[in-house]
Amino acid sequence: MKIANNTVVTEFILLGLTQSQDIQLLVFVLILIFYLIILPGNFLIIFTIRSDPGLTAPLYLFLGNLAFLDASYSFIVAPRMLVDFLSEKKVISYRGCITQLFFLHFLGGGEGLLLVVMAFDRYIAICRPLHCSTVMNPRACYAMMLALWLGGFVHSIIQVVLILRLPFCGPNQLDNFFCDVRQVIKLACTDMFVVELLMVFNSGLMTLLCFLGLLASYAVILCHVRRAASEGKNKAMSTCTTRVIIILLMFGPAIFIYMCPFRALPADKMVSLFHTVIFPLMNPMIYTLRNQEVKTSMKRLLSRHVVCQVDFIIRN
């Protein structure tokens, strides 16, 4: 595509993770494996929670939504990345870039807020158990779910508005494997200081505050659990520990990316790869499958499926 001073950029060229064919092949295989685990794993969690009438506590509503967000989030980047590995020229249209950027921040922002809601749920369940049924009633839970989806939308639309107002008339090469605000704004034909500052406040500072708030809330819960002498102490400790792991895995890369928008770092691509492809696998592998009730329900569901298949084969 020829680019002159008066030419409007209509597409971006993605430079990808690496130019090495051997490394690209290795990464392609690894990402394909991750993706084939992420989608079935998260949808199995959703189906298990939806089909078991015993999993009605607020925790399972939140886990089901977390699985849906993870599956959707991985769908935004991974499939196109796999196709690009097989293409000589990795091109994404301007509209496609904006669309990808919107859904990344919509789903990512919603997931961050969901983790805050889940921390509040654990605080009520562990530190204020007598108030659990009144505070975390179905109406309140659905209101919080609506609020976090709206919060993710507002966060994302701010990013999109920032991009749509920028003129692009020069270079069109993105040094990454997907579209994100940090790389796109560097290609605009105007001074980016104010935009990058707004980006720090909208993404970086919000991510950092959520991260610190989550760590503080789980620190309070862990202190409360350690002082308690109850049969469920070990289970509560284990639950909180896994959630702290999820928080570190999700917010660590996000803080690294969005708190330093003014300069490119050598580790940017690997951090982005972890955040967009590998992290969504953490929900089924670390989070939900540590829940005994979900595992038991999943085993019953799979057993019924096997029995139905065997019965069908015998009858035919």
Curated annotation (Swiss-Prot):
Residues 50-57, 121-139, 220-235, 290-316 are cytoplasmic. GO terms for molecular function: G protein-coupled receptor activity; olfactory receptor activity. Keywords: Cell membrane, Disulfide bond, G-protein coupled receptor, Glycoprotein, Membrane, Olfaction, Receptor, Sensory transduction, Transducer, Transmembrane, Transmembrane helix. The chain crosses the membrane at residues 26-49, 58-79, 101-120, 140-158, 196-219, 236-258, 270-289. It holds the Pfam family 7tm_4. It comes from the Eukaryota. The keyword Cell membrane applies. Its main location: membrane. Residues 1-25, 80-100, 159-195, 259-269 are extracellular. It is a multi-pass membrane protein. The keyword Nucleotide-binding does not apply. Disulfide bonds join 97-189. InterPro entries: GPCR_Rhodpsn, GPCR_Rhodpsn_7TM, Olfact_rcpt, Olfactory_Receptors. It is found in: Cell membrane. Glycans are attached at residue 5. GO terms for cellular component: plasma membrane. Odorant receptor. Belongs to the G-protein coupled receptor 1 family. This is Olfactory receptor 4N4.
